[in-house]
């Protein structure tokens, strides 16, 4: 009798994989194990919950029970996997164990929290569960400090500002979105955030936090202090690799997989935010969707390599939305930037005048798909 496929995790990657497997095979045994409730929600919505007045439970799209019934699964929610015996093909928790033929790690990534004194006062918004734990504090907060001016930090800063809160955004870089694009490209969004009232503290660093009678005192570099009611870390994600490491799998930044999503063990695969695909960590929806389609085929014996096309990344800042694609972080590109009231088109070209990256905003976002077709890969 087949032990089937066991998937550890229940987020977007795991669900996309289940749906793709069931399109091809209605009966192969599928087991999902995860530490959370396994209810489905759209993770990108977490960047907009405050301005839209949503509670954590409002985000639920489908309960775990409904998902299990629809796709013929065995689910084990609120279950921590403690070990994987790769040789015996067994997954273990404190009170249970499961045999598998093929195992998929879809354990996601956790929010990085700066290691400063008072770090226990820092909130993260990387899951519905995390939002549920702090939604009352965030709803009641008048003054909010967001640590990290990347994609998520910029989205959160705009959302909290739109909700009428006093927002301070701090980052040690000289501009927002510094790991994604040069300052001459991000300056349009940076200016819009400032116009809205976001207080930007760039080239600045959080050094510590302390609870006070009236809030939280944040100590910054250069002997500066501000008092706020809530502090949120948006300083990046770290792939969850501890379980894979204990199983003896090859780990770098994430769980290392090849073009077939296969780890260093032939019967164990990794998918989503925890995976490092041929040296790349790609924590975006489109590569996860494409990876899930390919992995479903591979698990069912139809070996197919993953080939990722040029893909759009969307920055969901409603007052000034952006789409970007290509190698926007490359230092050697020359940028041609065209701005007008309706939006911006920024093209990054190499020494051969080949288009290597672009960023478009607002009404000019309709040009994104045309530019995508001309992007040199």
Swiss-Prot record:
Record-linked Gene3D superfamilies: 3.30.390.120, FAD/NAD(P)-binding domain
Cytoplasm keyword on record: yes
One protein family per Pfam: Pyr_redox_2
EC number(s) recorded for this UniProt protein: 1.18.1.-
Chief place where the protein resides: cytoplasm
Pathways involved: Nitrogen metabolism; nitric oxide reduction
Subcellular location field: Cytoplasm
Gene Ontology CC, one term: cytoplasm
Coiled-coil parts of chain: none
Enzymatic reactions: 2 reduced [nitric oxide reductase rubredoxin domain] + NAD(+) + H(+) = 2 oxidized [nitric oxide reductase rubredoxin domain] + NADH
Family: Belongs to the FAD-dependent oxidoreductase family.
HAMAP family listed in its UniProt record: NorW
Protein name: Nitric oxide reductase FlRd-NAD(+) reductase
Organism: Escherichia coli O6:K15:H31 (strain 536 / UPEC)
């Amino acid at each position: 009798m087949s032990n089937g496929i066991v998937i550890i995790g229940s987020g977007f990657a795991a669900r996309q994989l289940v749906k793709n497997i069931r399109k091809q095979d209605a009966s192969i045994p599928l087991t999902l194990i995860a530490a959370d409730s396994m209810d489905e929600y759209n993770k990108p919505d977490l960047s907009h919950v405050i301005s839209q007045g949503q509670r954590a439970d409002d985000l639920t799209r489908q309960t775990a029970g409904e998902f299990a019934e629809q796709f013929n699964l065995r689910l084990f929610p609120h279950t921590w996997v403690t070990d994987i015996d790769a040789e015996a093909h067994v997954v273990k928790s404190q009170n249970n164990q499961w045999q598998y033929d093929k195992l998929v790690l879809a354990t996601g990534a956790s929010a990085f929290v700066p290691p400063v004194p008072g770090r226990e006062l820092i909130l993260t918004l990387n899951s519905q569960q995390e939002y549920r734990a702090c939604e009352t504090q965030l709803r009641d907060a008048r003054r909010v400090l967001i640590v990290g001016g990347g994609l998520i930090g910029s989205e959160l800063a705009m959302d909290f500002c739109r909700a009428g809160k006093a927002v301070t955004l701090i980052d040690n870089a000289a501009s927002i979105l510094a790991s994604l694009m040069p300052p001459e490209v991000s300056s349009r969004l940076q200016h819009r955030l400032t116009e809205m009232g976001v207080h930007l503290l760039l080239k600045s660093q959080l050094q510590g936090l302390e609870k006070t009678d009236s809030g939280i005192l944040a100590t910054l570099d250069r002997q500066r202090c501000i008092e706020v009611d809530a502090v949120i870390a948006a300083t990046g994600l770290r792939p969850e690799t501890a379980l894979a490491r204990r199983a003896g799998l090859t780990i770098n930044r994430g769980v290392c997989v090849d073009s077939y999503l296969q780890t260093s063990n032939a019967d164990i695969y990794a998918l989503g935010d925890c995976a490092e695909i041929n040296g790349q960590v790609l924590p975006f929806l489109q590569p996860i969707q494409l990876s899930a389609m390919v992995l479903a085929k591979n698990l069912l014996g139809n070996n197919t390599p993953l080939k990722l096309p040029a893909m759009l990344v969307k920055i969901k800042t409603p007052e000034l939305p952006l789409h970007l694609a290509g190698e926007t972080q490359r230092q050697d590109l020359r940028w041609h930037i065209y701005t007008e009231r309706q939006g911006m088109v920024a093209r990054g070209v190499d020494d051969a005048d080949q288009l290597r990256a672009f960023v478009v905003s607002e009404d000019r976002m309709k040009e994104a798909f045309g530019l995508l077709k001309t992007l040199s890969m």
